[in-house]
């Protein structure tokens, strides 16, 4: 079977490599070691060159490609350790709105995202291991919604315009957009110095137009969001694993011990080969999962688990 990329996909990959090689050098990345890990200049450059429109329909200003092509973007961001956290914006918000919303107000958000405006999501909750059943509550009051709850691990929430939040209500699960200024944000520490936040939602009143999906499709939309998020994060892990494998190949072909290049030692070459095999397995299951999401909308939970397991194995 031929798993090679199409010509335009190779061009997307090559052009991203040129941009990120320059903007994500070691010297550039050091600037974000101790500060807020978000590069506005790089975000603007990606927007100007149309990369934020990957996976977004042309009628919304996107480039019209599919989720596989969006995966190329996240793979390259992972490879170069780019100081950008875009899964909340380009995946959770953009892809979910594109698939489940029919209103012009929400569709206009896609156009603004393509131009570089940031949105994010807040789905995970403390003490809740089942994201499909949110603890955060929404109560209907006429044409308004009153929301209360706590979310955490929300990426770049402090610089996002709005936050997509999952809530439980009398009408089932809902996905609603909340303006950043209506919630309390608390920065959270992380080993990777990622810009993640705790989001406290206290008696926030919203219009029902803040619901991004049709009535009765909230749980379906949330499941889709969770699946596509995991797949795209796996693409980031693929990029990281590819960089690690490249570093291993470089080091073992140059370092000498006992008068020989260590790459010629059987144990070293076997471990390096194992890394390469895990890398290509991760690439293949990512391709399969993204293609199935395109064809079927929601892929099987077993397939998502397989993607996650291979991602973890490759990381080890």
Model segments located where?
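Structural signature of FAD isoalloxazine-binding scaffolds in flavoprotein oxidoreductases
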Residues: 64-73, 130-134, 205-206
